[in-house]
């Protein structure tokens, strides 16, 4: 009996390293395989669309246990780009992002919900304009695998919406323009 138990323990200890575990990834911003874009309704007739050109982050992910995933992102708010220099200057002002005081926004996940078929809800805290609030991102695991350069990558998309007033942005653009929609594309390179 002792020999069988010992054999089982040895066998289990040999198999343990083969069990799936979360891998750590760094967001591939140098290869331009990630983006943070936003859109805000313009008077209810159209949209102002922009992006943040400078951000960084990392995440851990295991497809076998997506609820254990973790995400951390830092955004340089000075890098906002709506393809219009004067508007960008206004977005950076105290009317909106107040980048002279708050040059960085952050998102840190707290929990991840697995909705099946690669769909996830990433719950976390967004700090923007000096205000931290909970935010849920509807995400989808696009895929993962070896790249042609000997690395391993995982990619995701995500969307979320938040009210500007929740983050201390009091500029009144009218009721049709009170929310910001974020579209996220993330490709990470395994560390």
Curated annotation (Swiss-Prot):
Coiled-coil blocks: none
Entry annotated with the keyword Repressor: no
Alphabetized UniProt keyword annotations: Periplasm, Signal
Subcellular compartments: Periplasm
Signal sequence segment: 1-22
Pfam family, one: YceI
Name under which the protein is recorded: UPF0312 protein Sbal_3041
Organism for this UniProt entry: Shewanella baltica (strain OS155 / ATCC BAA-1091)
Organism phylogeny: Bacteria, Pseudomonadati, Pseudomonadota, Gammaproteobacteria, Alteromonadales
């Amino acid at each position: 009996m002792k020999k069988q138990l010992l054999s089982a323990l040895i066998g289990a200890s040999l198999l343990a390293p083969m069990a799936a575990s979360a891998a750590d990834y760094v967001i591939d911003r140098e290869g331009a395989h990630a983006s943070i874009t936003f859109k805000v309704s313009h008077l209810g007739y159209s949209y102002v669309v922009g992006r943040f050109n400078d951000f960084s982050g990392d995440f851990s992910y295991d497809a076998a246990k997506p609820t254990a995933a973790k995400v951390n992102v830092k955004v340089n708010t000075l890098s906002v780009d709506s393809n219009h220099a004067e508007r960008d200057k206004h977005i950076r002002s105290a009317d909106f992002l107040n980048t002279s005081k708050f040059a960085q926004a952050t998102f840190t996940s707290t929990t991840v919900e697995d909705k099946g078929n690669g769909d996830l809800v990433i719950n976390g805290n967004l700090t923007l304009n000096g205000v931290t609030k909970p935010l849920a991102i509807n995400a989808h695991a696009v895929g993962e695998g070896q790249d042609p350069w000997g690395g391993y990558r995982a990619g995701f998309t995500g969307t979320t919406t938040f009210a500007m007033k929740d983050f201390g942005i009091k500029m009144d653009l009218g009721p049709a323009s009170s929310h910001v929609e974020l579209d996220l594309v993330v490709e990470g390179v395994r560390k």
